[in-house]
Amino acid sequence: MSLRIVSSISEIVDVFEQRGNSEYGGEDVTQIEHALQSATLAESESASAELISAALLHDFGHLIHSLPDDAPDNGIDDFHEAAAAKSLCEVFPDSVTEPIKLHVRAKRYLCTTDKNYFSKLSHASVTSLNLQGGTMSDQELHEFESYTYWQDALRLRVWDDLAKDPKIHTPELSHFIDFLESSLI
């Protein structure tokens, strides 16, 4: 699978315009709705521009691969977190790409450390959790906590899991362009 490396915000906008209306992995929202909800939640909590950008772009990897929308239902882990981080690394700093790269591990971490977190996951998120390795071992927990941006990844993960409501209205993508621009390398 070839990976698209983006070099500008206009390329990111183009990808959202071309693929953003695709299904968001078995949820009742599209990819763009999920991204906008995540970023809106981050903004509502006064997150930094970099973390708002990470919230907007955390699932960008789903938009740049050629797998079907239902890949997780077919037992396929698309490693979207790594794809997104790699695709965006030439235009954004680690403060954007590292929380993106860690947000899947953050779900595993939260399901291991918070007894109630697993019960908050949607069916689709439980399916992907199993593909992504399930809960963490003690060694994996300690390794996760050693990453510089692990706490940002946890915040991002919570917004990610809340951003699946088809009734929520958010600002348009254009609202978040200033956050993206201020986060550029």
Task: State where each predicted segment sits.
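Metal-dependent phosphohydrolase cores
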Residues: 1-185
